[in-house]
Amino acid sequence: MVLVLAAGTSGAAQADCKFTATREGSADLAGVTKVVVAAGPGELSIVGSADARRIVARGNACASSQELLDRLNLEVRREGDTVFIDAGLARAINMITIGTVYAHINVGIALPTNLPVEARDSSGPVSVSGVAALKLDDSSGDIEVRDVGSVEIKDSSGDILVDGVRGDATVTFDGSGDIEIRDVGGNAEVGSDGSGNIRFSGVLGNVLVGNDGSGDIVVENAGGDFTVGNDGSGTINHRGVAGKVTLPER
């Protein structure tokens, strides 16, 4: 069975949500050491709270038909010490992104602050706050991360904001979109960036940009070294760097 789906979650799909439903799931905390999230099209919000007594996921499903709505799932299950949260269309469906047919689910997840999170998201905005550690693989959509222990992001497109990291903040790969990383207690790194501006501020450790295709790079107030490996185009500006500054020759 092949279903034709809208490529994104904006436009007609958002304004004309013909069929809607709520989804919910939860899991006990005892013995849990990690949460793994897989989300399809739609908004994804993950919030850590010191008051959380369970892991709770709630979703608002939206589709152009009842058949598609019935296939939009939100599953919370536990395997050993890991809780898995899966949101989106049933795996048995093949999807072609064309036309006006649409299906997506906006998901909010609440969990304790001491749990690390691994998340994979296909499209739509992502916001994460208050978790012990975050590893995020995102295809498209803006990303906002605040008040986390550490963060590692791989992103194809969309802007990235990271604000408030107690440890290290790393963007391993970013295809396009601006990146802003600020208030970091450890090191801050962008491994490879295709296009878009990059800004660092308030980093206690080292700042590293491995490879930058295009866009400006700005560093303000870094406690360690500032290093750029390769830079295709765009300006590089820095002030308040306590350590060594190493930039590519032009």
Language-model segment annotations:
Residues D163, R182, S201, I217-E220, ...:
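Conserved positions within tandem-repeat grammars
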Residues V171, V190, V209-N211, V228-N230:
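Calcium-binding motifs, dominated by EF-hand helix-loop-helix domains
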Residues G124, G141, G158, G175-G177, ...:
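Periodic glycine anchor positions in long extracellular repeat architectures
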Residues G11-D121, P125-D138, E144-K154, L161-F173, ...:
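Acidic (Asp/Glu) and glycine-rich low-complexity loops/linkers
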Residues F200-V203, L208-V209:
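Intrinsically disordered, low-complexity segments enriched in Gly and acidic/Ser/Thr residues
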Residues V218-R250:
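Hydrophilic extracytoplasmic domains
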Residues M1-G8:
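Bacterial N-terminal signal peptides
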